[in-house]
């Protein structure tokens, strides 16, 4: 287990006042000491997780300097997303008695007894990038339905509302894939001039998408767009290899994919959409609000990252080759998103600004 921990700063505690002024938010009457924070991450084995940790450590360092928290530590479990290893990690973290425990879990259920122990100790527990049925835990997450809605609508708009599309599906039988496919097909059914000419499972992976499309592309008519879940780079490469016109696609917002797109690969109107590695930061600020006495919904939805054609070059400047684009959440932006959750306006809430580096 790798644990990095910053020293504790002495700071006067300040109430964190939400920008959302609504009668459903109750604020604590007494000032509290700035909280200590621990983050438990199930594994560190891909670019999304590494980007999530980087974003969290940057935001937590600033939050500590601003006196919003007194200290933080990040613990990444060894291995490949093992619930057993994360449970051992969590038990070690609980010995430090943090005020806030943020968890990117290996399982939505296996950690529950250990997380219940944290709740019983009075620790604010927030799960992100996943879910849990543990009633004492808060959930901060992106909606897979929103991801599917935003990327599918972008492809529909990109092809002018008419033409042939292929649906590149995710991990067969998984709950996210089922949810995303339902949204995709519903949107497509509302656009009768868009015809689905093929479906294939690509596991949201560029290499698998390239292989699957190359094996079927000869049998397909002209394809104007590929509706999917971030495998756009592989889809474009398949059409390039086959000598076909390039379709409108949904890329993953990695630095490499964005640069590939920026070099003219992919038809105009393409987009990049993915769940936000900044969810850990959003969970941090939401948990600070809870710690300071605010009442928020048990589950709060935050937007996925959306990179449009006109914003692509700004994102390229902000994202390293091996990083995944993420929103740079602040306390104020999180408060606005919490207000949108309370008011039922999540789908129409304004997105954060494009990061500047």
What are these regions (language model features)?
Residues 16-25, 253:
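C-terminal segment of classical bacterial N-terminal signal peptides
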């Amino acid at each position: 287990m790798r644990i990095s921990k910053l020293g504790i700063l002495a700071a006067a505690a300040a109430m964190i006042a939400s920008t959302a002024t609504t009668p459903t938010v109750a604020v604590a009457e007494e000032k509290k000491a700035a909280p200590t924070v621990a983050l438990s991450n199930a594994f560190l084995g891909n670019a999304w997780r590494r980007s999530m940790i980087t974003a969290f450590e940057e935001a937590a360092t600033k939050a500590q300097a601003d006196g919003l928290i007194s200290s933080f530590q990040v613990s990444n479990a060894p291995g490949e997303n093992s619930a057993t290893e994360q449970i051992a990690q969590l038990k070690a973290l609980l010995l430090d008695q943090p005020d806030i425990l943020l968890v990117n879990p290996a399982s939505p259920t296996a950690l529950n007894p250990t997380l219940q122990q944290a709740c019983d100790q009075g620790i604010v527990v927030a799960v992100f990038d996943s879910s849990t049925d543990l009633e004492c835990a808060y959930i901060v997450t992106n909606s897979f339905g929103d991801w599917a809605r935003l990327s599918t609508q972008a492809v529909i708009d990109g092809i002018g509302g008419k033409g042939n599309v292929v649906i590149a599906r995710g991990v067969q039988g998984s709950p996210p894939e089922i949810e995303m496919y339902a949204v995709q097909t519903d949107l497509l059914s509302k656009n009768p001039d868009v015809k689905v000419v093929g479906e294939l499972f690509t596991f949201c992976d560029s290499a698998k998408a390239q292989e699957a499309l190359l094996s079927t592309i000869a049998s397909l008519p002209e394809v104007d767009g590929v509706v999917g879940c971030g495998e756009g780079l592989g889809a474009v490469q398949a059409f390039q290899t086959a000598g076909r016109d390039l379709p409108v696609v949904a890329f993953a917002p990695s630095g490499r994919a964005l640069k590939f797109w920026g070099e003219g690969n992919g038809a105009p109107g393409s987009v990049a959409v993915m769940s936000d590695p900044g969810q850990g930061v959003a969970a941090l600020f939401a948990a600070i609000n809870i710690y300071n006495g605010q009442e928020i919904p048990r589950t709060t939805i935050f937007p996925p990252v959306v990179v449009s054609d006109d914003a692509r070059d700004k994102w390229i400047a902000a994202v390293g080759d091996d990083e995944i684009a993420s929103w740079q959440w602040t306390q104020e932006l999180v408060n606005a998103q919490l207000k949108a959750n309370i008011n039922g306006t999540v789908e129409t809430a304004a997105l954060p600004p494009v990061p500047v580096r």
